[in-house]
């Protein structure tokens, strides 16, 4: 938990700083052109990619080294492969998704501002204070990305630990913020290579089965990943929990 908190705190500060800078650039762009061409998003995407890539490397390395030390094995070379794979598979898509969300929210803010008869400076201010750049957004990103990267590292390095019959167990936070369907998953065990089957609520009622390799697995969708605090435990069927 301490490792998770320290790592997410570091990313939180960096993302908040980037969002403040990006908000100012977006405001200035609209003031300059009386329109929005989203030039600011190019700088944002490049900076965000660098921040996330560096963070993923730090998270996965720290998590993997801790697990390797606990098992008294030497798999340092594997860590570099795990890091490179995660950065390649996740970072670009994550940056693109958040950039597109930002574009859509600003476009909506401009549309509403024009409909309300606001002046260019007033709309520019609305852009700067748009929820895309809100501090809570940085906190959500920091928590979610740190959590997913840590769980990914645990999942990947668990295959290198020489376990005879590797088991994984879903471990939930179990407090008043825990999703009810994650509370139900608490203590669920499956073989490492199998998928957790998470019955996830859908709009309009009912549930859909989401298959996840580990807690925080992006395949579970936003409802299972954003701000999730569950962790996966890995151990041999005849071993103590690690």
Language-model features, listed with the residues they occupy:
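Acidic, glycine-rich two-metal-ion catalytic cores of nucleic acid-processing enzymes
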Residues: 137-242
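N-terminal leader/targeting and assembly helices and adjacent pre-domain segments
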Residues: 1-132, 233-242
């Amino acid at each position: 938990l301490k490792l998770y908190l320290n790592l997410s705190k570091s990313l939180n500060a960096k993302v908040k700083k980037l969002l403040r800078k990006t908000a100012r650039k977006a405001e200035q762009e609209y003031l300059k052109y009386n329109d929005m061409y989203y030039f600011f998003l190019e700088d944002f995407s490049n900076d965000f990619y660098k921040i996330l890539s560096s963070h993923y490397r730090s998270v996965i390395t720290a998590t993997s080294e801790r697990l390797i030390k606990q098992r008294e094995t030497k798999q340092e070379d594997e860590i570099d492969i795990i890091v490179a794979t995660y950065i390649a598979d996740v970072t670009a898509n994550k940056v693109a998704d958040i950039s597109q969300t930002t574009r859509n929210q600003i476009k909506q803010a401009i549309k509403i501002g024009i409909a309300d008869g606001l002046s260019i400076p007033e709309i520019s201010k609305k852009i700067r204070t748009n929820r895309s750049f809100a501090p809570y957004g940085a906190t959500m990103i920091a928590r979610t990305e740190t959590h997913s990267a840590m769980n990914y590292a645990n999942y990947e390095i668990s295959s290198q630990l020489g376990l005879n019959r590797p088991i994984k167990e879903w471990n939930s936070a179990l407090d008043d913020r825990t999703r009810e369907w994650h509370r139900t998953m608490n203590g669920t065990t499956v073989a490492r290579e199998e998928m957790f089957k998470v019955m996830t609520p859908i709009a309009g009622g009912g549930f859909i089965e989401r298959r996840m390799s580990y807690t925080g697995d992006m395949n579970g969708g936003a409802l299972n990943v954003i701000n999730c605090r569950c962790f996966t435990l890995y151990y041999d069927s005849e071993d103590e929990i690690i």
